[in-house]
Amino acid sequence: LHFIIQGGYTLKYLDKKLIVKIDEEMSKKEVLEYMINLVCENTDLIENKAEFSEKIFAREELGTTGIGRAVAVPHARCEDVKDIVFSVALLKNPISDYLTPDSENPKIVILVGAPKSKNSEDMKYLSNISRWFKNKENRDNIMLSKDRDELIVELLNIGE
């Protein structure tokens, strides 16, 4: 799956199997564990699930990755990640224990894993994801997705 984010960067690392819609109410920890499992079970890009999980949660300890506007971008770089990987979750219920600068609990979570060797590329993608989700219309279109297929269609519309 390839799609374009504003600014012309292709997110060549996102796979349809890594896009989910979650209807159950979940805590921040549950969502992150779910997404980590999703990436590890559906790709061969994570060589050590325990280390990747530890890095994701350690990053959260440094400060929230909730960027506001109902969006969170948990991310980590570690040696056991072979290439950049993205997973997207749309939640029916906001994550009530996920801190954000504007107190708007996340309903969209983009999990990003990257190898230590791709630091600048990783930062470029994180910056573009953040910029893209500042657009209210983009966020609304994602949040209005009724199911996984609609969510995929909306993600494919990024940058058009």
Give residue spans per PLM region:
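Cytosolic covalent-transfer regions centered on His/Cys nucleophiles
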Residues: 1-160
